[in-house]
């Protein structure tokens, strides 16, 4: 098996097997990769134009999860939830909604990442005011038990392949490929063993997805993959045709969230 065969197969619109997808993820994201950046870029571009079946997307999500460890939260009592937004201009909802859910008695566990494309991620916003989101699983568990919530950056042990793939996607114009977004988002959500997963799927000029039809298609894709993993989830499709709130920019968005 070699990457050239996989690129050609996907370029022809054919379905890849689980073994082939595992080969791509493992060989490109390992410490000494046998797949070069330009070969990975070619493969990802083929995925962008030819798409992936639900089975392929499931395999890619699974391979990303299996590249690292899962985060077991069973030692924490109560209902544990994870909330994720696909991102939009001025989107600071996670910073507001998380503490509100804790006030209602829920436990909020959020594994986050930097923003892709033109939207700032939750980690970017917190980093702008000096909040340290780099912590061990042990420290995150302490926070969850003590205050009912944590927002942490991806650790090297959780979905390490996703960090590598996000970097190459951001540099090659493949950020908007739906199967790649799906695998990236859900791998982190599924690796974190919460009871429920809530996703805010945005569309419009301020989001990476420009219309409702595409958002609905993506939402259905994510729900199908979640069901294949036997995880409970809910997806809200929300309009992002204007900025959320009255501030745009990481630091002032945090200030707006605090003043909400």
Per-region residue spans from a language model:
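Active-site-proximal loop->helix
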Residues: 115-131
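Glycine/serine-rich anion-binding loops at beta->alpha junctions
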Residues: 79-102, 106-118
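Generic structural signal for well-ordered, non-membrane alpha-helical segments
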Residues: 3, 14-21, 36, 40, ...
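Acidic, glycine/proline-rich low-complexity segments that act as flexible tails and inter-domain linkers
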Residues: 1-90, 128
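Short alpha-helical "patches" and their helix-cap loops
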Residues: 55-66, 113-115, 198, 202-203
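Short, glycine/charge-rich beta-strand/loop segments that flank catalytic centers
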Residues: 77-81, 113-119, 139-145, 157-160
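Buried hydrophobic packing segments
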Residues: 47, 60, 97-104, 122-125, ...
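Glycine-rich anion-binding loops and their surrounding alpha/beta cores
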Residues: 9, 105, 128, 132-134, ...
